[in-house]
Amino acid sequence: MAVPRRKTSPSRRGMRRSADALKRPTYAEDKDSGELRRPHHLDLKTGMYKGRQVIKKKDA
């Protein structure tokens, strides 16, 4: 069975665990509709992405 040669310091343990935290997703307000959407994603309500119509507009 493998055994560590040295004890892991609290600093090194913390640096290893620093990437484990969950991050809250970021949202940007759409300029045209005012809806919140993810950056670099299309707006599903209007179907627009970077000023172009990508998909048909969703009718409510």
Swiss-Prot record:
Pfam families xrefs: Ribosomal_L32p
Keyword match Ribonucleoprotein: yes
Keywords assigned: Ribonucleoprotein, Ribosomal protein
GO terms under biological process: translation
Ranges of Basic and acidic residues composition bias in the record: 17-44
Coiled-coil regions listed in the entry: none
Disulfide links within the chain: none
Region (Disordered): 1-60
Domain of life (superkingdom): Bacteria
Annotated Basic residues bias: 1-16
Presence of keyword Ribonucleoprotein: yes
Molecular function terms, GO-annotated: structural constituent of ribosome
Any one cellular-component term (Gene Ontology): large ribosomal subunit
Family the UniProt entry places it in: Belongs to the bacterial ribosomal protein bL32 family.
PANTHER family (UniProt xref): 50S RIBOSOMAL PROTEIN L32, LARGE RIBOSOMAL SUBUNIT PROTEIN BL32
Protein name as catalogued: Large ribosomal subunit protein bL32
Organism: Rhodopseudomonas palustris (strain HaA2)
Lineage: Bacteria, Pseudomonadati, Pseudomonadota, Alphaproteobacteria, Hyphomicrobiales
Gene name in the database record: rpmF
